[in-house]
């Protein structure tokens, strides 16, 4: 497929990937930068999956009027074609919907997974909805975007939002970045913090538990205890009990965890509360070195988060 395009300044543009990212904050900022500088941009959203797909429902990309784009709505097989469609529609000013893979008129664009996807292309008219989303995420609050194809409008939903079609609009829910709170003066803690730096998570490592740290624990936080000392764990566990992080894991053997549970029950913890603690921490049994343990812990955190995100998607409309 060729990509000649005639823009308002009578220049030809070809779609070009600006950089690789699937981080929604980076994608939305890319759009905001264009709009704030007076340039046009299109928001592309994955709104339907038929069969398998490489990206989740609600995945997005942004295409600027100069042809540069970022984000993913597939495994990389339709992004250039979608960018071409976005550039073409900027001239008309009319939003559109396109299908790729199964059920698509484009026989030369095949999804390796064998399924099909539907994308909506919305010409952004204001940066305000995107700025509102970014501001909520900066405040570590859940937020959503609602796109109405008939009105060709985009609005911010200042509340927790499930991704999917809702009445005549498609809504995308966003959660704050995962925050890792790692506690312990140990090789395991250092290795976990080092590996976490590559994940894009907001990572913090502590030796002792500062009083100010309890305010940083929220429902998008993973609390990881790598202390080798049950008594030093207790202030962190008590803070986590109130804040309810989505993940709470602790280092130690089954015997150590039995002692931990005894201490917590003495402090008034219920059985339901103590079952929220993942111990021994990690998905690999009996990890014997620090880096394997770090990988095991972060894999478990990612798994729990993934299940949480899957639960936030609406079932397909009938």
From Swiss-Prot:
Q: Which UniProt keywords apply?
A: Chaperone
Q: Is ATP-binding tagged as a keyword? A: no
- Function comment: Chaperone required for the production of an active PaoABC aldehyde oxidoreductase. Stabilizes the PaoC subunit and is required for the insertion of the molybdenum cofactor into this subunit. Binds molybdenum cofactor. Binds the molybdopterin cytosine dinucleotide (MCD) form of the cofactor after its formation by the molybdenum cofactor cytidylyltransferase MocA.
What this protein is called in its record is Molybdenum cofactor insertion chaperone PaoD
Please describe the quaternary structure of this protein.
Answer: Homodimer in solution. Interacts with MocA.
Give the domain of life. Bacteria
Organism field: Escherichia coli (strain K12)
What is the reported phenotype of gene knockout? Answer: Mutation results in complete impairment of cell growth in the presence of cinnamaldehyde.
Instruction: Report the GO molecular function annotations.
Output: molybdopterin cofactor binding; protein homodimerization activity
Pfam families in the record? XdhC_C (PF13478), XdhC_CoxI (PF02625)
